[in-house]
Regions:
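Membrane-embedded segments
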Residues: 57, 61-144
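Alpha-helical transmembrane signal-anchor/signal-peptide segments
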Residues: 27-50
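C-terminal regions of proteins
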Residues: 248-324, 331-337
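Acidic/histidine-rich helix-loop elements
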Residues: 79-85, 208, 212, 287
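Conserved, well-ordered alpha-helix/loop/beta-strand core segments that scaffold catalytic motifs
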Residues: 107-119, 178-274
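Alpha-helical scaffolding within the catalytic cores
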Residues: 38-42, 64-65, 94-98, 217-223, ...
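Secreted/periplasmic serine-hydrolase-like ester/acetyl group-modifying domain
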Residues: 125-230, 316-337
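Hydrophobic membrane-insertion alpha-helices, especially the h-region
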Residues: 5-26
C-alpha cells in the first residue's frame, strides 16, 4: 500500500511538472497572432478541409501575390497557399511532402525564386517556417536540412531553449493567445491593402555568378519526382516582382530544367503588362510584393491559365464546396473593405 502511494505521488509530481513545463513553454514561445504573423501561417493549413485542386508552395512571393479566394471567385478553383517568409527550396520540399500526406491536388505550383539561395540564411526565418509545423518525419527532415551551425535540434524539440529570454519581453499577445490561435490568412494568402508605389529601383548590377547551386537543383529534382509519384502535375512559376531582379540567366536555367522534365514554367515577370499590373497602385512595398489590388489581378490571370492549360474545372456548382467558400468569401470581402 505504501509502495502504491509512493508510485502515485511520483506520477502526480511528474504530471504537474510536465503540465507546468508545457505551460511555460507555450507562454514563452512566440504566438504569431498579431506580430510576425508570417510565423503562424504554416499551422493554419491543418484545420482546413483537404480538398484543394491547387497547392502553392514557396516564399513570400506566393503568400503575398496569389489569392485563392479570387481564384475561386473568378474561376471556381479551390487552392491553398503553403508559403512562408524566405522559404528555402529544401523547406519547400518537406512542406510539399507533408502536404501530400494530407491530400492529392491536381496541380502543385512552385515559385522558383528560392533557387538563388543554396545555403541556410537566417535562423529567424527558419523559425517562421518550422516552429508551427506538426511533429512528423517531415518536420524532422526540414529541421535537419535547415539548421545553421549555431542551431541545435534540441532547441526545436524544446522551444524553451530558444525562447527562454522572452520572459522579460512578454506582451499582451502572449497572454491573450496562450490557449488559442488566430488565423490571419485566407487559404494561406496574407492580405495587404496598403499602397506604397514604386518610385526608384536599385541599379541592375551584374552578378558574380548566375548559376543556381547543386543543392537547389537536387531538391527541385526531388520535388519533381515526388509529384510524379503522387500523380500530381508540377508547375513552375516566377512571381511578378520588380525587385530583387530575376535575370535572364536565371530564367534560362529554369526554362532548361522545365523542358528536360516536361514541366510548364511561367515567368510572370515578363507578363506584367498582360496581367494589367500597375506598380504605382498594386504594391504595398515598392515593387517587391503585390497588395490586394495586385493580387486580385494576378490571381484572376493565373487562374485562367490553370483552367485553360491544366484542365482545372469550375467547382462553384458543387454544393459542399460552395457552402464552404461562400462563407470564406464573406469573411474575405469583409476584411477587404
Amino acid at each position: 500500500m505504501k509502495k502504491t502511494k509512493t508510485v502515485l505521488s511520483v506520477i502526480a509530481v511528474l504530471v504537474v511538472f510536465v503540465l507546468a513545463f508545457g505551460l511555460i513553454t507555450r507562454l514563452l514561445t512566440p504566438k504569431y497572432a498579431t506580430d510576425l504573423v508570417e510565423g503562424g501561417m504554416i499551422a493554419e493549413y491543418y484545420d482546413e478541409e483537404k480538398n484543394h485542386d491547387v497547392i502553392f508552395i514557396g516564399d513570400c512571393e506566393v503568400y503575398s501575390n496569389f489569392s485563392p479566394m479570387e481564384m475561386y471567385r473568378q474561376q471556381g478553383i479551390t487552392a491553398y497557399v503553403r508559403g512562408t517568409s524566405q522559404q528555402l527550396i529544401w523547406q519547400s520540399y518537406y512542406i510539399l511532402k507533408e502536404t501530400l500526406k494530407y491530400e492529392t491536388p491536381k496541380v502543385v505550383v512552385y515559385n522558383v525564386n528560392a533557387m538563388r539561395y543554396d545555403e541556410p540564411i537566417k535562423e529567424e526565418f527558419h523559425r517562421l517556417t518550422i516552429d508551427e509545423m506538426r511533429w512528423s518525419e517531415e518536420k524532422v527532415g526540414i529541421i535537419q536540412a535547415s539548421m545553421t551551425e549555431e542551431e541545435t535540434f534540441a532547441s526545436y524539440v524544446f522551444p524553451i531553449l530558444r525562447y527562454h529570454s522572452r520572459f522579460q519581453h512578454l506582451t499582451s499577445e502572449d497572454f491573450t493567445y496562450l490557449f488559442r490561435d488566430k488565423d490571419n490568412t485566407f487559404n494561406g494568402y496574407l492580405m495587404k491593402k496598403e499602397v506604397l508605389p514604386v518610385e526608384k529601383l536599385p541599379a541592375k548590377r551584374p552578378l558574380a555568378s548566375y548559376e543556381f547551386g547543386e543543392k537547389c537543383y537536387d531538391y527541385l529534382e526531388k520535388m519533381t519526382q515526388l509529384c510524379k509519384e503522387h500523380g500530381v502535375e508540377l508547375v513552375l512559376i516566377k512571381a511578378p516582382s520588380l525587385y530583387p531582379y530575376w535575370y535572364e540567366q536565371h530564367d534560362a536555367q529554369i526554362q532548361d530544367f522545365a523542358s528536360k522534365h516536361g514541366l510548364a514554367y511561367y515567368d510572370l515577370t515578363r507578363q506584367i503588362e498582360t496581367i494589367g499590373l500597375d506598380f504605382t497602385q498594386d504594391t504595398y512595398d515598392a515593387g517587391l510584393h503585390l497588395n490586394l489590388s495586385g493580387a486580385t489581378k494576378l490571381s484572376g490571370y493565373f487562374g485562367k491559365l490553370l483552367v485553360e492549360n491544366h484542365g482545372l474545372e469550375d467547382r462553384r456548382n458543387e454544393l459542399e464546396i460552395a457552402t464552404i467558400y461562400d462563407e470564406k468569401l464573406r469573411l474575405y470581402d469583409e476584411a477587404a473593405k
